[in-house]
């Protein structure tokens, strides 16, 4: 795989994570760069690992991954999105929210995994292409880290505009990302 193709692959793999990061940034109370970077690193690490796992699985699991990846991603993002909407409604007057400016590691990791399931499937395909999987995975992870960090900071602007309802907006964004993943896979079938 040539470097230009690898760059486009890395950017394409980071788009779902970028969209989810916009939602995460919108739901945070004035996120600092360090929080955006932390989120980017979590997403980037998971997005680096998933194509390697997919590459290792190979052709046998390709049919399973292709037939279920969109449903798994949609379900995870739907549940996370609904949870964020619920918290946004429930916590309007309740101060028992997570610390302002921070999401838990597990919420970020599950969201990152949900948006990286397509990278798992891509990894399966990369097993049959002349590509150095380590370089490809690192490129995908780096692109995701950068895109997610930017997405969280851009989401901050969105969060400032919508005020208290930012977590609801973030949840809606996650649901839209999940629905888009599902739609793209079903319409291609």
Curated annotation (Swiss-Prot):
Alphabetical list of InterPro entries matching this protein: Mntp/YtaF, Put_MntP
**Signal peptide position in this chain?**
none
Keyword terms, alphabetized: Cell inner membrane, Cell membrane, Ion transport, Manganese, Membrane, Transmembrane, Transmembrane helix, Transport
* Top-level taxon: Bacteria
What's a single GO MF annotation on this record?
manganese ion transmembrane transporter activity
Function in brief:
Probably functions as a manganese efflux pump.
Q: Hey, which family's this protein in?
A: Belongs to the MntP (TC 9.B.29) family.
- What is the designated name of this protein? Putative manganese efflux pump MntP
Taxonomic lineage of this organism?
Answer: Bacteria, Pseudomonadati, Pseudomonadota, Gammaproteobacteria, Pseudomonadales
């Amino acid at each position: 795989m040539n470097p230009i193709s690898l760059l486009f692959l890395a950017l394409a793999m980071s788009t779902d994570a970028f969209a989810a990061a916009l939602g995460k940034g919108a739901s945070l109370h004035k996120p600092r760069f360090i929080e955006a970077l932390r989120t980017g690193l979590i997403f980037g690490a998971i997005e680096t690992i998933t194509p390697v796992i997919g590459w290792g699985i190979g052709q046998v699991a390709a049919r399973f991954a292709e037939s279920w990846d969109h449903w798994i991603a949609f379900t995870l993002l739907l549940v996370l999105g609904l949870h964020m909407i619920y918290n946004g409604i429930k916590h309007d007057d309740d101060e028992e929210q997570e610390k302002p400016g921070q999401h838990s590691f597990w919420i970020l990791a599950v969201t990152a995994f949900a948006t990286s399931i397509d990278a798992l499937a891509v990894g399966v395909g990369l097993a049959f292409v002349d590509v150095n999987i380590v370089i490809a995975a690192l490129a995908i992870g780096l692109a995701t880290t950068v895109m997610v960090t930017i997405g969280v900071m851009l989401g901050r602007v969105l969060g400032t505009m919508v005020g208290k309802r930012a977590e609801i907006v973030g949840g809606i964004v996650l649901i839209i990302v999940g629905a888009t993943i599902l739609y793209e896979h079903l319409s291609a079938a």
